[in-house]
Amino acid sequence: MRAGLSLLLLVLVFGAQALAGEGFPCPPTPPDADGPFYRPGAPVRTRVGSGYGLTGEVKSAADCSVIGHAKIEIWLAGPDGLYGDAWRATLFSRPNGRYAFSSHVPGPYGSRPPHIHLIANAPGYRELITQHYLAPGTTGAVFDLVLIPDD
């Protein structure tokens, strides 16, 4: 019952935000919950482990143009399924909008599928809080972060 209520709350809160992104030439990345383990101030680094690579571009939903120097905060469960400072990072997209991050495959956390949390920020755009869900058996993925311009 509690899981159902949580899902309903997510749909109500984030569904409205997702609908606000409709009509853009570049579909915005869907928002997702930040969860209870976010902590600001993660060290600037692009690697917290090896075995899984996440790459992509930060883009504008308005015209699909790339956004350089966007701040991306990342956190994930460690191999043992526990969150900790060793599994947190802050990185920035390159001038061409691209980013790359290396980690281990996140360990199991409760009944949740393996996932990586991300927050993307850039001047002139709404903050994006989302999650990347790993496909089983993969060693990497491309995950673009498409941001909605400020009103």
Feature-to-residue mapping (PLM):
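Beta-strand-dominated extracellular/periplasmic modules and repeats
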Residues: 21-151
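Sec/Tat signal peptide C-region and signal peptidase I cleavage site
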Residues: 16-20
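Bacterial N-terminal signal peptides that target proteins for export
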Residues: 1-5
